[in-house]
C-alpha cells in the first residue's frame, strides 16, 4: 500500500475550499488532463454524506472507470472518498481543511491506495504509479486553489450550495 500526502495553502475561507473540493463540476474541470468525467451516481453539484460518483478517465492510455463513495463527512473540516469499484485494490482519499491563522486555508490530502496484482502492483506503485498520482493531485489542487482565490468560485457555489443543486 502506498500513501501520498500534499498540503496546499489557499487564500480563501475553509468552507469555500471544502465545498469546492467536493464539487463534481470542479473535479471534472481540475482533471481535464485525463479527460475525466462523471458518468454515474452524482454527476453534478456537491457530493454529500454517503453519496457516490462514478468517474471515467484516461490514464496510461487506458480508459478507466472508478466509483467512489463519501464515507466520512465533517463539514467544513474533512471528508473521505473511498473506492467502491474500480482498478485499485484499495483507495481512501482524506481531504482535510484547517484555518491557516491568516484568513486562509491549509488543504491537506492523505491519499492511501493499493494497486491490484499483489507484488506486480506494489512494483508499479514504486516505479511510476505514485509519481503519476502525485502529479494528478498537485494539478487538481492547483486548479482548485486558482478557482477558490478568484471570483470563479461563484460559478460553482452559492451560499455553500452548488447552483445545480438549487434547481
Which role fits each region the language model picked out?
Residues 1-48, 162-167:
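Hydrophobic ligand-binding cavity/cleft-lining segments
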Residues 28, 38-85, 106, 139-155, ...:
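Glycine-rich portal/gate segments that line the openings of hydrophobic small-molecule binding cavities
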Residues 80-137:
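Beta-strand/loop substructures that line and gate deep hydrophobic ligand-binding cavities in soluble
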Residues 3-5, 63-67, 90-93:
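Short, surface-exposed coil-to-beta transition loops
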Residues 10-12, 59-61, 72, 87, ...:
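Beta-strand elements of well-folded, non-transmembrane domains
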Residues 18, 22, 82, 110, ...:
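Residues within alpha-helical segments
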Residues 7-11, 56, 69, 96-98, ...:
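Generic structural detector for well-ordered beta-strands
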Amino acid at each position: 500500500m502506498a500513501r501520498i500526502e500534499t498540503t496546499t495553502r489557499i487564500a480563501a475561507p475553509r468552507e469555500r475550499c471544502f465545498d469546492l473540493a467536493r464539487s463534481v463540476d470542479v473535479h471534472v474541470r481540475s482533471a481535464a488532463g485525463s479527460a475525466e468525467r462523471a458518468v454515474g451516481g452524482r454527476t453534478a453539484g456537491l457530493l454529500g454524506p454517503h453519496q457516490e460518483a462514478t468517474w471515467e478517465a484516461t490514464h496510461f492510455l487506458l480508459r478507466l472507470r472508478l466509483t467512489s463513495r463519501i464515507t466520512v463527512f465533517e463539514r467544513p473540516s474533512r471528508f473521505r472518498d473511498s473506492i467502491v469499484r474500480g482498478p485499485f485494490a484499495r483507495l481512501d482519499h482524506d481531504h482535510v481543511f484547517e484555518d491557516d491563522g491568516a484568513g486562509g486555508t491549509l488543504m491537506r490530502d492523505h491519499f492511501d491506495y493499493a494497486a491490484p496484482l499483489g507484488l506486480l502492483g506494489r512494483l508499479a506503485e514504486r516505479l511510476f504509479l505514485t509519481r503519476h498520482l502525485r502529479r494528478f493531485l498537485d494539478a487538481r489542487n492547483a486548479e482548485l486553489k486558482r478557482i477558490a482565490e478568484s471570483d470563479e468560485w461563484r460559478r460553482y457555489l452559492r451560499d455553500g450550495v452548488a447552483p445545480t443543486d438549487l434547481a
